[in-house]
Amino acid sequence: AQPSGPLATRRQWLVTQMPVGLAAVGAAGWLPGTAHALPARALSFPRDHGSHPELRTEWWYITGHVQAQGQPWGFQITFFRSRVDGTQQLQSAFAAKHLLFAHAAITDVRGQRLVHDQRIARAGFGVAQASEADTRIRLQDWTLERSDTARGKPDFAASRYTTHIVGSEFGLDLVFDSTQPVLLQGQQGLSRKGPDAAQASYYYSQPQLAVSGTLQVGN
């Protein structure tokens, strides 16, 4: 379907700096063939900003709202990594041992319209990768990266995230700076999802990030 109304023409707008919400990393699942609960452990950063390939499912996501040209917009960016249990013993470099997915969207609040796009690829070959050292995720032409900006700042202001997203009807080039400490969900980062102890994930968030950059809408 062709876009209509305010999204009919590709336009680029400067985002007014303001706080947004960020839930940066979650990891769920366990090693193949087990039903054990995830062990409680102290999360360590920046290592735990990165990927954990021994876990079955992992995700990094950003949600927020901005003002651009005096108009409100919402946005969502999510990257997933999924371990494929059945291919872990294969020796071929082409074996799809991990899959990366991504989904992104912009909400035109005034125009009451949602536009979105997605990507998927197997990890490797420079096409899709998720670093274990820190948040550095690439899926084709979409990226999400974290860098340390502590230089003389308090600990809670130590993170800067950047993302580059180009969809069929929109684009996002945004920078997010932390304004408060990491928030550990559940019991020091181990978040129960149900009555069974195995129904849990490691989960933390960084809310109230200050955001700046540009967004594009239209095709």
Which ranges hold each PLM region?
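One face of beta-strands
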Residues: G64, F75, A102, L172, ...
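Surface-exposed, glycine/proline- and aromatic-rich loop segments on solvent-exposed faces
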Residues: F75-D108
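Active-site acidic/histidine clusters and adjacent loop/turn architecture
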Residues: K97-F101, A105-P207
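Short acidic, Pro/Gly- and aromatic-enriched capping/linker segments at domain boundaries
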Residues: D48-S51, A197-G218
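N-terminal secretory signal peptides
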Residues: A1-Q12, P19-A24, A28
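Short, Gly/Pro- and small/polar-rich lid/capping loops
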Residues: H36-T63
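Short Pro/Gly-enriched beta-strand edge/turn motifs at strand-loop
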Residues: L43-G50, T87, R192-A198
